Amino acid sequence: MSWTTDPRDVLRVTDDFDLAAFDRHGKPGFDGKKSDGEQVMATRGELLAELQERLFAEGRAGGERSLLVVVQGLDTAGKGGVARHVMGMVDPQGVQLRSFGVPTKEEASHHFLWRIRRALPTPGRIGVFDRSHYEDVLVQRVENIVPEEVWRKRYREINRFEEKLVASGTTVLKFALMVSYDEQAQRLMERLDRPDKRWKFSPGDLKTRAKWDKYQEAYADVFRFTNTEHAPWYVVPADRKWYTRAAITEVITRTLVDMQPRWPEADFDVADMREQLAQTMSTSALKESLDDTASTVESAIDSSIDVREEAIELRGDKKAAKQAKQQRKEWEADLTATLKQKTALLNAR
């Protein structure tokens, strides 16, 4: 049991998207149950972690690309769970997580995008926004914090901002987690019932819930006016937490596959550096390193090629399959040269 369809195809907002008719308990594109979804997510997480590390390495080497994941949703929709369970599968040093609550006094004194720009992911990193600049056309609209002529102008400002962001090398993924009215009530009640969850509850949650219809209208307009080719919206059913997390994992992974991050080439003479390092090692340490070289490097090659092959399967790219075979040959030739040099260095002792 797995994905029968690329979730990007079934979750992406279309021109005729109707939020009122959206099935918030569904699992579009997936034909399995919860245990299947959790297994697929865990397996895909290994690929996600490898791709994230490549993107991070690319950034360290001077690359300019990054990925921004925007997660929106009403209270209890599962935004925090995405950060913990999805991004928790990758190296935290490559992730920049930012949660946007009520603007501080300083933030409120600036343009609404000021605090967003300050939190954008740096090259090589994945940025995750728990709430975002869309609060300024959702909360500020429904709560009448700013007049209509102000928040209506923001749709266009957001589109221009995201277009420039993409042009600068940041891929933007926008997820709206849509929980049903009944499911939200169940989750809020659980927070009240459990002593260890009460810290998550606020009396204001009920005030927000009382404006459910207004928030649904605001979200519908967000999809209508800010769903663009360069930064599309993916609306995710949120009544099943496992599906929400699995779907977002799949979309992020497939997006990184399409980005094709690569391990950067060394900008120094590897053989020369190896020789200099060997001169600082004892004979026994150098021999131990030589003995471990083949198994260590072969394992790394196999792991990297496995990732490539899994990515190729997702993309269905025959040309990429040939490139993967060629890459294996090049790495194996490099290993042969490495073993030859280290053997010569050891024999020269």
Where are the language model's segments positioned?
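Glycine-rich phosphate-binding loop of ATP-dependent small-molecule kinases
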Residues: 1-349
